[in-house]
Amino acid sequence: MGDAACQECHQEISNTYARTAHHLTSQLPTKDSILGKFTSGQNILMTSDPDLHFRMDAKETGFYETGVFWQPPDQKTRTERIDIVTGSGDKGQTYLYWKGDQLFQLPVSYWTDLKGWITSPGYSEGVADFDRPILPRCLECHATYFESIPSEKAENYYKKTGFVLGISCERCHGPGRAHAQYERSRPDAVSSGGHSIVNPASLPRERQIEVCAQCHGGIGQPIAPAFSYVPGQPLENYVTLPHPDADARVDVHGNQVALTQRSRCYRSSQMTCTTCHEVHAPERAAATYSEKCLQCHQDRDCGEFVKLGAKIRENCIDCHMPLQDSKLIVSDLNGEQVKARIRNHWIKVYPAGQNP
């Protein structure tokens, strides 16, 4: 159905949600949605191979990445158009292109901390690889809907029409067509609230958490078609996720739910993701999250209170939810590893200097 139908009644929420990382996690390419620079001198990514560099160009027909190979005396190039932007830009962006009905990732991404272009995460630096397929599980966490085309050749075939970019209302509230039709049929009546729509806040705690866990619960193993999960249904019917106590690598990228469930805060209360997160508006300030901590905790109970005093109220999370290098989002820049730093959701006391 799309968000436009929701705006008819929920304009204020729609306006604030449009600025969130969830909503912006995939977009069509424009001069505003692509954060990388296309101006001369800022549109080149050199590599450790002196015979290879990448050039990013903005043309009337779109935005492009070109691999330039020197094989003296000839120069060879491969150019592909940026068709989809993924990533809100909080950490960075990567770019996808269509080849027929197949989706692939481009070799150059944008890294926000560096304010520049970089080799896409997981790619070998100094290699022009345009052939990494985009699988359904990737799209599930960066879009609202894509329709797969069954193929024995590969999993990255999709219909090029009807897809919905960004995480829209229906990913968390379920299909909205029946709800919208019902409300439109009674324009003078008081809103029915939850008629034919899912309000995650009204779900049992486990089902609430699973709405977030469909993307923030780790990669998991799909056991149902992509985009078939409906909020309120048991997530275990759609994807098998690692148990929060499993003795396995827990990475801060895409596994925030398991880390939260290991936390004493979670296990000794009825806390959910929305206890701390306002999902309909952008929130980034440490003090904002610290206010949530102080709804349950007293500042004087913190071991650092004697040293810092009331100032400690401004930032609980840097000590108790420290930023951690991701093991999965790693790029290579001229032989140096560049890792995304993401907030660890295992809430606890970390001894000074301990690497979480």
Task: Show the residue positions of the predicted features.
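Propeptide (latency) domains of metzincin metalloproteases
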Residues: 94-102, 106-140, 144-156
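Primarily the internal scaffold of c-type cytochrome electron-transfer domains
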Residues: 4, 12-86, 94-96, 118-124, ...
